[in-house]
Amino acid sequence: MERAIFAGGCFWCMVQPFEEQAGILSVRSGYTGGHVPNPSYEQVCSKTTGHTEAVEIIFDPSLISYSDLVELYWAQTDPTDAFGQFEDRGDNYRPVIYYTDERQREIAERSKQTLQASGRFDQPIVTSIKPAEPFYLAEDYHQGFYQKNPERYAQSSAIRHQFLEEHWQ
């Protein structure tokens, strides 16, 4: 099994696309990239901990590749916006691919270069690619949010879905 960590704005919106893929064992919402151990949601939202909301994905590489996960990640985000994603603004919503080893870094960097060269976007691709840092699980009520709160999830992800339809489909 392997692990992937992606930050792409609100973690509620990053779970379902990965959970729907064959070879995914778990997708958990949490926080990473900051300087406070085991932060709470309230602390992260205060924008004082340095963390970003992210998802940790455990996957079977014999069924789905890390490269496939990176491609799916791009299609869930606006890679030209370094200051948040869609209606979620601020450093705690910044887009980051966190790599766990050198192979993942190379795959992510190559994929980013390919996306930039594709001409899909007029603006530069600004998503960061950084080494993985400690990943802290978010509170239980954030886990599987789209399943527990489908109406609130649909409302919170509407702007994202509109962008994805316009740019990725």
Curated annotation (Swiss-Prot):
Catalysis: reaction(s): L-methionyl-[protein] + [thioredoxin]-disulfide + H2O = L-methionyl-(S)-S-oxide-[protein] + [thioredoxin]-dithiol; [thioredoxin]-disulfide + L-methionine + H2O = L-methionine (S)-S-oxide + [thioredoxin]-dithiol
Q: Which UniProt keywords apply?
A: Oxidoreductase
- Entry's Gene Ontology molecular function annotations: L-methionine:thioredoxin-disulfide S-oxidoreductase activity; peptide-methionine (S)-S-oxide reductase activity
User: What top-level class of enzyme does the UniProt entry assign?
Assistant: oxidoreductase
InterPro entries, per the entry = Met_Sox_Rdtase_MsrA_dom, Met_Sox_Rdtase_MsrA_sf
Any idea of its EC number?
1.8.4.11
| Source organism superkingdom | Bacteria
Q: Which residues form the active site?
A: 10
Pfam families per the UniProt record, alphabetical:
PMSR
GO BP term, pick one: protein modification process
Q: What does this protein do?
A: Has an important function as a repair enzyme for proteins that have been inactivated by oxidation. Catalyzes the reversible oxidation-reduction of methionine sulfoxide in proteins to methionine.
- Family membership noted in the UniProt record: Belongs to the MsrA Met sulfoxide reductase family.
Q: Please name the HAMAP family in this protein's record.
A: MsrA (MF_01401)
Name it: Peptide methionine sulfoxide reductase MsrA
Recorded source organism is Streptococcus equi subsp. zooepidemicus (strain H70)
Q: What gene codes for this chain?
A: msrA
